């Protein structure tokens, strides 16, 4: 019997789009995010399509994660799919100029939050005899760009953590997928530039980025494949994005 789908960072972006996609398919949902007002509205809306349960949660707080997951009521507590979506980027300054608090926040959210949610929920998924863990990574894990520094490092962790989860869970009937999107027009850049709408919007000037719905389609697809198929890693970019050529500094530029 299909269990519930738990999505972190469900109040916007990939998380919200994924919630809508799974709700349309009638899957029971556990939606977690820091912004309670948004989660409450989303749960009220999607409950018309599928059973929904909302959690106000900051994944950086280990104790809060453990308490929240332990108190998920039936039938939602039978989590089959864990979508670790909560994450963010802050700033584009070089490593010699960046605010160290930005790095702390990215590490606490993108790495520690991922670990807390996975370690807390995984025993249940093992006990139920199977399921799927989907981790949201980024092309920044593989392709460096100026200002990515700690953000790219955290997403490289997500990539390698996902691979090692696969190794740990061999024989447990649990699939693990790392989905790595490129440029996508969500609230990502708005958060990165601390609410500067002009700066955030300019990131996508003159090109068609991915949309949150595009990534949600991918997440839904990998979780809907026959149970014997595991998509280990899936990197996706808009057509008009590719990896950059090697950067070369010329003496004349000094």
Please annotate each region the language model reported:
Residues 37, 57-67, 100:
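The beta1-alpha1 cofactor-binding region of Rossmann-like NAD(H)/NADP(H)-dependent oxidoreductases
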Residues 118, 154:
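Active-site helix of classical SDR
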Residues 11-12:
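Conserved glycine-rich cofactor-binding loop
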Residues 27-42:
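Conserved glycine-rich Rossmann-like NAD(P)H-binding loop of the short-chain dehydrogenase/reductase
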Residues 138:
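Residue(s) in the substrate-gating loop at a strand-loop-helix junction
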Residues 93-95, 99-107:
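Substrate-binding pocket helix/loop in short-chain dehydrogenase/reductase
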Residues 178-182, 197-245:
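C-terminal helical subdomain
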């Amino acid at each position: 019997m299909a269990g519930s789908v738990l999505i972190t960072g469900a109040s916007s972006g990939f998380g919200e789009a994924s919630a809508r996609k799974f709700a349309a398919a009638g899957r029971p949902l556990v939606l977690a995010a820091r912004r309670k007002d948004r989660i409450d509205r989303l749960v009220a809306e999607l409950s018309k399509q599928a059973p929904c349960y909302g959690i106000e949660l900051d994944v950086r707080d280990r104790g809060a994660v453990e308490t929240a997951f332990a108190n998920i009521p039936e039938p939602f507590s039978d989590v089959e799919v864990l979508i670790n979506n909560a994450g963010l980027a802050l700033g584009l300054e070089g490593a010699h100029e960046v605010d160290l608090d930005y790095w702390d926040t990215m590490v606490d959210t993108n790495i520690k939050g991922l670990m807390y949610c996975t370690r807390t929920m995984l025993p249940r998924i093992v006990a139920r005899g199977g399921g799927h863990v989907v981790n949201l990574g980024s092309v920044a894990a593989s392709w460096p760009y100026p200002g990515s520094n700690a953000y790219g490092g955290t997403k490289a962790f997500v990539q390698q953590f996902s691979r090692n989860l696969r190794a740990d869970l061999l024989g447990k009937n649990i699939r693990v997928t790392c989905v790595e999107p490129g440029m996508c027009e969500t609230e990502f850049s708005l958060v990165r530039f601390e609410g500067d709408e002009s700066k955030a919007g300019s990131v996508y000037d003159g090109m068609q980025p991915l949309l949150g719905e595009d990534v949600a389609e991918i997440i839904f697809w990998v979780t809907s494949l026959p149970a014997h198929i595991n998509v280990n890693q899936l990197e996706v970019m808009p057509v008009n994005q590719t990896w950059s050529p090697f950067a070369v500094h010329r003496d004349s530029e000094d």
